Amino acid sequence: MFSMTVAAMRRHRIAGAAALAAALIAPGAAAAAAAAPAAQASVSRSALASGYGGSRAGNAALNWAEGHARGCWYSYGGSSCSPGYDCSGLVMAAFGHGAGIWLPHSTYSMLGNRHLHRISLSQARRGDLMFYGSGHVEINTIWYHQTFGAHHSGQRVGLRKWSPWWHPTAAYRVW
């Protein structure tokens, strides 16, 4: 089960993650993220312990992605299993088909979308979007340090663990 405490998660956050993520945010998105109510990130103790507590939209999107896109090939610019998904195409399809929220097919455009609300990495839950400094996006799972996404050419859509050189720099919840 989930044995990492919230305090331990905070200690493992990357130094400077906020600065890196701020560099990714399109003009106007920072103000929208800052204006989001603080209550959006609050979750119950049982939700923290279980790893759940993300939005309904995020849970629905991850369920759709795991059921419909797992095992499909990566294809740059793709947004369906044939020919394949790229990272933002998978997120767009998962939230569109799974939750009825159609996000743009571009990682950078997603950051400025009104449905995304910035949260700290330690507050990330199942279904939240995890952005990487390289312009990559994946969907968070309930497992600490693991995301679901379309990674790169030659790989299939699926789970990926974080590593010292590959980890998110920003997290967003979709409402």
Region roles according to the model:
Residues 93-96, 102-103, 158-160, 168, ...:
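Short, surface-exposed, polar/charged, turn-prone segments marking secondary-structure boundaries
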Residues 13, 24, 73-75, 84, ...:
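Residue-level preference for alpha-helix termini and adjacent loops
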Residues 2-73, 122, 144, 162-175:
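Intrinsically disordered, low-complexity
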Residues 2, 100-163:
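...with weaker cross-activation on analogous glycine-rich loops/strands in unrelated enzymes
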Residues 51-55, 67-126:
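Catalytic cysteine-centered active-site loop
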